[in-house]
Amino acid sequence: MPALKHEVHLRLRAIELIAHWEGRLITTQLMEWFGITRQQASSDINRYNTEFNVQSLVHNAAVKGYVPVTGFCPVLTSGHVNEYLSMLASQGGQPMAQVLEAHPGVATVQLPDRAVRPEVVRELVKACRTGSSLKTLYASMSSPIPHE
């Protein structure tokens, strides 16, 4: 991996997490989270797409943003949903750079790994974004037969 400034590395990780788990990345997210210009956000996306995960994001005019290609594989993050959930949970008004930064000497309790497919999370995010409803099936340990 090329030598990067710390802030750039954090933005590239955010690009990967958002694209992987939300299925859509827009420059506005990076601008708001990191306090950067649209040109810088576009430059970071282009850099990710040419230097780190070549041609893994394509611009989609229908969604007005970048979407991951079929078979997208994260290269800067582990690909576990916990990274994405931690990013969302700990944002709480903080600049995203502080959220994604590792804090040496500080330990936190990690959520157990979950077997979650990005496609499922993307549909949930899309429903939240568009105000749509989802039809789901639920099964519990005490009642393993799925029901709506």
Where are these regions (language model features)?
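Bulky hydrophobic/aromatic content
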Residues: 68-139
